């Protein structure tokens, strides 16, 4: 998934914070 440990991974939206 795009959300990993609260960080935004490149090319993924929306981002998790």
Swiss-Prot record:
GO molecular function annotations of the record: toxin activity
Post-translational modification as stated in the protein's UniProt record: Contains 3 disulfide bonds. The truncated conotoxin tx3e is only found with a hydroxyproline, whereas conotoxin tx3e is either hydroxylated or not hydroxylated.
Distribution of this protein across tissues and organs: Expressed by the venom duct.
GO cellular component: extracellular region
Main location: secreted
Disulfide bonds: 2-16, 3-12, 8-15
The entry's keywords: Disulfide bond, Hydroxylation, Secreted, Toxin
Domain of life assignment: Eukaryota
Compartment annotation: Secreted
Domains as described in the record: The cysteine framework is III (CC-C-C-CC).
Family the UniProt entry places it in: Belongs to the conotoxin M superfamily.
Name of the protein: Conotoxin tx3e
Organism: Conus textile
């Amino acid at each position: 998934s795009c959300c990993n440990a609260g960080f935004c991974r490149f090319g993924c939206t929306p981002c998790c914070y």
